Amino acid sequence: MEKVKYMKRIDFENGTITNNILNAAIPMLVAQILSLLYNIVDRVYIARIPDVGTNALGAVGLCFPIILIMTAFSNLFGSGGAPLFSIKRGMGDEKSANTIMNTSFTMLCGSAIILMCICLLFAAPLLTLFGASDTALKYAYPYLCIYLIGTLPSMIATGMNPFINAQGYSTIGMLSVAIGAIANLILDPVFIFILNLGIKGAAVATVISQLMSASFVIYFLKFKAELKISFIRKNELPHCLNFAKDIISLGTSGFVMQLTNSLVSICCNNVLSVTGGDIYISVMTIVSSIRQMVETPIYAINEGSSPIISYNYGAKRPGRVRKAGLTMGALILGYTAVMWSIILLAPHMLINIFSSDTSLMENAVSALKIYFAAFIFMDLQYIGQTIFKSLNKKKQAIFFSLLRKVFIVIPLTYIMPYALNMGTNGVFAAEPVSNIIGGSICFITMLCTILPELKQMENDR
């Protein structure tokens, strides 16, 4: 079987856990930062379009729910398939691992085409449902329609990258993201300002960039990776059905997490449009963008740790699973403590990245401080969710995805502004309250269920 000889691979079975996680997480961190540029660069440039920047920025924020739905489907098949892929490789069953990857790829492509058609058909009514005013719709509709054309390459680039990382090629995974992100960085000012396409130009630049990333991912997995990608053939369908069920079952937690993020975004925008108007939708767009920036290294550490945890769990090495979980938790908590301090002490610095509008700045500073007041508790949710997903604990992963967002955040988004008369502050305050409650419950449950299982596995060896 052909292998990539010129790229150093990570040995999940041997080597120190800390080095393995860092070797996987650092390239992923670079990749995640570059991936963040897809959306952040758009927002920075859009906010600076003469005369219409603030309104256009809010309009892009109204498109977030649909973009999050696309990410949700990518996670359903990518994050659902990759841990199973790693577990099978840890067991030495590479044939099943390859079938899992191909099943994920086939389902991902099919869902991308269906999703694109549905969203294009209902783009205008969906944006209105999300809280778009007539002014906002003028900017949001063309941006969204162009963005949706790139649904398939966007989902391939996002959903299939975990299978590159799961084979130990984290640097290649980083490179696949870098190609598109750098292209977007170059193309955005060209299409927005030089060609004078405004907000439409931002969408065109993003679609072209996503196409470049997706092309690289397919090329590598088809021709260079150890386990190669292909569509599932008709005669393989019966054999793949069980794998498809397992992929969807495990991926449902990541799917639900992104889907509920979309639902929360819709609810927040609806309440803010009533209690604060269009300017507060722009404020929420900035707050959400800063959250994405802050969370990027956390996602990198999680995704860098996940294949190591899954592989060693499949290989029945509980000591390495436990150590990987502890290392992941320490890295995440240490990083968050630093970023939490910066957000609370220097919010202006972060907001200035997106806009220097005086009225926007005044409202955004207080909103940012409230929103991130208990952000460190969110780490407990991330750690618990990653462990559950990596160990194929489907029910727990799905439950805790739903608990914090659906049963805590969304009700509070309406209760705090209206029932408690907190207005716009209530929308932003719903987040820290949910972090404390949901994060604590998830983490404690993880400790009480996973540690005894690892102890039992150790005794059985």
Located regions from the model:
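Alpha-helical transmembrane segments and their lipid-water interface positions
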Residues: 31, 35, 39-46, 71-78, ...
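Small-residue hotspots at the loop-to-helix junctions and early N-terminal turns
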Residues: 54-65, 140, 144, 203, ...
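Small-residue-rich hydrophobic transmembrane alpha-helices
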Residues: 57-117, 154-173, 269, 281-341, ...
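Transmembrane helical elements of multi-pass membrane transporters/channels
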Residues: 23-42, 146, 180, 209-213, ...
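N-terminal transmembrane alpha-helices
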Residues: 12-52, 65-80, 84, 109-116, ...
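Helix-terminus/linker motif at the lipid-water interface of multi-pass membrane proteins
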Residues: 33, 37-57, 127-134, 190-197, ...
